Curated annotation (Swiss-Prot):
Subcellular location: Membrane
Record field: transmembrane: 10-30, 48-68
A GO term from the CC aspect: membrane
Principal subcellular localization: membrane
Membrane topology: Multi-pass membrane protein
Protein name: Uncharacterized protein L416
Alphabetically ordered keywords of this record: Membrane, Transmembrane, Transmembrane helix
Length: 105
């Protein structure tokens, strides 16, 4: 589990997006130039801060604090002791797959 709120990659994504939006807006970084009625105007562009925040999220989520692997066979079940299984259709040639349906509700 998380020991700090900053280990949650989604929190870091939101914080980095807000901070980058403020920085890009205040310092007028990445403004797009638009011609309206013969006048050249610079408008705020939110795409660059979003792209940088997504890169930060990917690094945070997959490299710094990757999700732990879940083993289905050893996971604690919430419902009863029996598990519902969905098998293969006879003659279909598809291997049998066990799906834990107890925790789906």
């Amino acid at each position: 589990m998380y020991t700090s709120i900053y280990q949650n990659s989604y929190v870091v994504f939101i914080i980095s997006l807000i901070v980058l939006l403020i920085i890009f807006y205040v310092f007028k970084i990445g403004y797009s130039t638009v011609v309206v009625n013969g006048k050249v105007e610079k408008r705020f562009n939110w795409k660059y801060p979003l792209a940088i925040s997504l890169v930060i999220w990917v690094i945070w989520y997959f490299l710094l604090y990757p999700p732990s692997d879940v083993n289905i066979n050893s996971s604690k079940q919430v419902g009863g002791t029996e598990t519902s299984t969905i098998g293969d259709i006879v003659g279909s040639g598809v291997r049998q797959q066990k799906i834990n349906m107890d925790n789906w509700l």
